[in-house]
Amino acid sequence: GLDLFVIHVEATDEAGHAGNVAEKVRALENWDSRILAGLIPALDSMGPWRLLMLPDHATPLTTRTHTADPVPYVLVDSAVDGPGGVFSESGVAAEPLVPGYQLVSRLLAG
């Protein structure tokens, strides 16, 4: 069977609305240390897994509001070793735009 769960983190969005770069950095660091650091070992203990991480929308510090700008994403498959990349707003600008439904298809196709 397929297990699927969603984690929604609001802290980065709120920091964007506030225009607070330090809070946005702290929210991302907390995601890494408090959620991702425990999630990966837990997933590993259950067998093969895939993980799609992305924001639901952009909230640039400069505008302090939601925009339709492309967002970065990371799709990880535990069975595939490969080069890492940069997960950033500036990094996504050089990548081709992938519609959300295609990302979900890639996630579930594993």
Task: Write out the residue ranges for each language-model feature.
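Feature captures the catalytic ectodomains and active-site-proximal regions of enzymes
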Residues: G1-G110
